[in-house]
């Protein structure tokens, strides 16, 4: 059984305003309406409940959950999905506006393999991740690239993976649904020119029914075929 908030009678004093416009629809950051210190406290309580109360395990004193110095723009990898019809929020549906079948480049709605929320700004990965995603979508829409339909298994554009490293290197891998060399080259050449900070530009052709690409051979289109996530100290 699932539910959603209809109205607030009285908000908890612990409730915080989410900083992401997609919070509550995107499943990526489920606790953003709690201050970070409270998130850590609740997560420590979850560990205690699952091991001691549910698991009946005798435990010593549980140390508090360790927090991160960064709560935004800390991820080094994000995978985005193309869809020929973007997910409409409840507010958009209830508003009755004629939005049409706009495409999406973003994240899956939790529990739905064929529904994708169009993301305007994600707070998980540092620049230039957002700019690369938005420019990719703009170029594809303006140049008539077809977006993936997971049920009908149609559309050229399937996925895009962006990796950023503390070294400053950026890897972009675009997954296409067909080996359309002309359109592949046009998009990748555009990204290379628009984002010179991309040090590794790759693509994969995936004609399978699922999105896994681990069994497919990536093509290094420009730059290196790898990035280094960490500097190794000589000492």
Spans of features found by a protein language model:
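Accessory RNA-recognition modules of RNA-modification enzymes
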Residues: 1-233
């Amino acid at each position: 059984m699932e539910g959603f908030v209809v109205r607030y009678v009285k908000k908890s004093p612990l409730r915080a305003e989410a900083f992401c416009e997609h919070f509550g629809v995107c499943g990526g950051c489920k606790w953003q309406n709690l201050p970070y210190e409270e998130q850590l406290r609740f997560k420590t309580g979850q560990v205690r409940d699952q091991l001691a109360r549910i698991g009946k395990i005798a435990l010593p004193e549980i140390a508090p959950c360790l927090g991160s110095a960064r709560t935004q723009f800390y991820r080094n990898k994000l995978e985005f999905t193309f869809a020929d019809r973007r997910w409409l929020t409840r507010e958009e549906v209830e508003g009755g506006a004629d939005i049409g079948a706009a495409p999406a480049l973003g994240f899956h709605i939790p529990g739905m393999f064929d529904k994708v929320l169009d993301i305007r700004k994600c707070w998980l990965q540092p620049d230039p991740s957002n700019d690369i995603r938005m420019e990719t979508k703009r170029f594809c829409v303006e140049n008539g690239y077809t977006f993936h339909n997971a049920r009908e298994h149609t559309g050229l554009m399937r996925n895009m993976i962006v990796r950023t490293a503390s070294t400053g290197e950026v890897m972009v891998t675009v997954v296409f649904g067909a080996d359309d060399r002309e359109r592949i080259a046009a998009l990748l050449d555009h990204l290379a020119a628009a984002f010179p900070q991309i040090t590794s530009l790759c693509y994969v052709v995936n004609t399978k029914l699922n999105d896994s690409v681990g069994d497919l051979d990536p093509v290094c289109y420009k730059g290196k075929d790898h990035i280094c996530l960490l500097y190794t100290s000589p000492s």
